[in-house]
Regions:
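Switch/communication elements of ASCE P-loop NTPase nucleotide-binding domains
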Residues: 1-26, 179-308, 314
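Phosphate-coordinating catalytic segments in nucleotide- and nucleic-acid-processing enzymes
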Residues: 19-210, 298-308, 317-321
Length: 321
């Protein structure tokens, strides 16, 4: 949660980049300009805790690829009795590893060994044509059951029976009473923007649930009815659905969504002053469990409300025009 320009998107992109490092042991510096960033990543693997430290540096000979410098890895056996000490340096012992890797490959390779996609980032800024192809790719090439695909289509348009990609240029859209072969451009005129984004969102969500992966969404409420957003959150909360422990990480301006959660320690407040700062609702604020979290936001207990004075300044400027 946080105001506009409070750093929420930057934080989610940082989380995505951490997942990329863990999953592929390398990282490209695209639009984030993260060269010079120092990272400390704590993670669990094969009954042990690891703390990884590095500084990301961009080198001209590596193109967009970042090099990993000043790398150190620390390890600790994991016991439930240590759960409150996970971020305490004193429980860790440094691993001495001989580095024999290219500069753009992290020494995490020696620990995790296999590449894996640990998280999906839902990007609704993509071209809608790209979103359609991406959604169908998730369905067809990542083992998503046909019945799940049809349920998703019905969820956003109950007249659609099926949607198939014939080739990279052609789709077959089947309604209750007819089928049509359409180019991607023609298909975009048949489906609403919300339907396309919803199909892409739910297909990626099911993929994350099936794999037990992370699923990252910036501004989860964008373009969707409140009920659909609540349904998506409930799928990740329900252990009967989320059998592999998939993790939903999202930002929102819609504070009523927070009332869906019984706990406070999974809610973070983002603020941007000289730097982006995250505070935890449970740890850093006094929040009574018997009060709606949304009410606390409306009362501006966390300093996240839109400035009334700024709104009035705009209104007065318009009145005086």
């Amino acid at each position: 949660m946080g105001k506009n320009a409070s750093g929420k998107t930057s934080l989610l992109k940082l989380i995505e980049n951490v997942y990329r490092i863990l999953g592929s042991f390398q990282l490209e510096d695209e639009l984030m300009s993260i060269s010079g960033t120092q990272l400390e990543i704590t993670f669990y693997h094969e009954n042990r805790l690891f703390r990884y430290e590095t500084e990301l540096v961009r080198q001209n000979n590596l193109g967009k690829n970042l090099s990993f410098t000043q790398e150190r890895i620390f390890v600790s056996d994991y016991f439930k009795s240590k759960s409150k000490l996970i971020f305490s340096p004193e429980i860790y012992t440094e691993l001495k590893l001989k580095r024999e890797l290219p500069d753009n490959i992290s020494i995490l390779f020696y620990i995790l060994k296999e590449r894996k996609n640990y998280a999906y980032y839902y990007d609704d800024l993509k071209d809608q044509d790209d979103m359609l192809h991406a959604a169908y790719d998730f369905y067809k090439n990542h083992g998503i059951n046909k019945k799940y695909w049809k349920h998703i289509l019905h969820l956003f348009d109950d007249n659609i029976m099926d949607l198939e990609e014939i080739n990279s240029e052609l789709f077959r859209l089947t309604y209750l009473d007819r089928s049509m072969d359409l180019s991607a451009k023609e298909l975009l005129t048949m489906l609403s923007s919300g339907t396309i984004k919803g199909i892409a969102l739910y297909t990626a969500a099911i993929q994350a649930l099936q794999e037990g992966s992370g699923f990252i969404i910036d501004e989860i409420e964008n373009h969707f009815h409140k009920t659909l957003v609540e349904n998506l959150i409930s799928m990740f909360k329900d252990k009967a659905v989320n059998k592999k422990g998939a993790v939903l990480i999202f930002s929102t301006h819609y504070c009523e969504l927070l009332d869906l959660f019984g706990r406070n320690d999974n809610i973070w407040i983002s603020k941007s002053e000289k730097q982006i700062i995250l505070t935890n609702m449970y740890r850093d604020y006094s929040v009574r469990n018997d009060l709606l979290k949304s009410r606390k936001f409306y009362d501006d207990n966390f300093g996240t409300a839109v400035s009334y004075e700024m709104l009035m300044n705009l209104k007065r400027a318009l009145m005086n025009e």
